[in-house]
A protein has these predicted regions:
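A short, internal acetyl-CoA/4′-phosphopantetheine-binding micro-motif in the GNAT/acyltransferase core
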Residues: 80-87, 115
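Conserved acetyl-CoA pyrophosphate-binding loop and the N-cap/start of the following alpha-helix
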Residues: 86, 90-98
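Conserved GNAT acetyl-CoA-binding A-motif
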Residues: 103-116
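Conserved catalytic-core motifs of GNAT/GCN5-like acyltransferases
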Residues: 111-113, 125, 130-151
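Short amphipathic alpha-helix that is part of the acyltransferase structural core
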Residues: 4-41
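Conserved beta-strand in the GNAT
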Residues: 53, 60-69, 73-81
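Active-site rim helix/loop that mediates acceptor-substrate recognition in acyltransferases
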Residues: 26-57, 61-64
Length: 165
């Protein structure tokens, strides 16, 4: 793993760091499945994407993210998952900000696709993303099971975009 940067301290005063995992990406599948419930869907982008791992100094994995190059000056945040014990403490938002700064030198736009749930839509809006478009029936057409978020069955993929320049 290559260390890319040091970060802030969390409420427990533990130092955090973000690294790029280039070898055994599949070992993070358990955490990646928190954000994308089907392993075969994750496999479609994990091998071609950059996998970022945020760790506490004691080695615990706090957060993971996968970013892909979609061509035409666009990258996509394909997966963002925060370990349950670290959720709702700002780590996901920090990771998104970090990735936006990191990729700003290579891409003009970052996209993210998500389901139509209040929690995730408001999260990405708070990170500076604005609505772009939707893909009707994405979840029902591509997943082998029903996906429910915030008590709502997901059908369409909503895409949000953020200018990085």
């Amino acid at each position: 793993m290559k260390v890319l940067g040091r970060m802030f301290k969390d409420v427990n005063r533990q130092d955090m760091k973000i690294e790029v995992e280039t070898q055994d990406k599949a070992r993070y599948m358990g955490l990646l499945l928190l954000a994308d419930e089907q392993e075969s869907m994750i496999a479609r982008y994990l091998t071609r994407g950059d996998l970022f791992v945020m760790r506490a100094d004691d080695g615990r994995v706090v957060c993971v993210a996968v970013v892909t190059d979609e061509g035409g000056g666009v990258c996509e945040l394909k997966n963002l998952a925060v370990a349950p014990c670290f959720q709702r403490r700002g780590y996901g938002k920090y990771m998104v900000g970090y990735l936006c700064r990191l990729y700003a030198c290579r891409f003009g736009t970052m996209m993210v696709g998500t389901g139509d749930s209040v929690t995730t839509v408001s999260f990405y809006r708070s990170c500076g993303f604005g609505y772009s478009h939707s893909v009707a029936g994405f979840f029902t057409d591509n997943y082998d099971h029903i996906i429910v978020e915030d008590g709502k069955v997901l059908t369409d993929m909503l895409y949000f975009r953020k200018s990085l320049c």
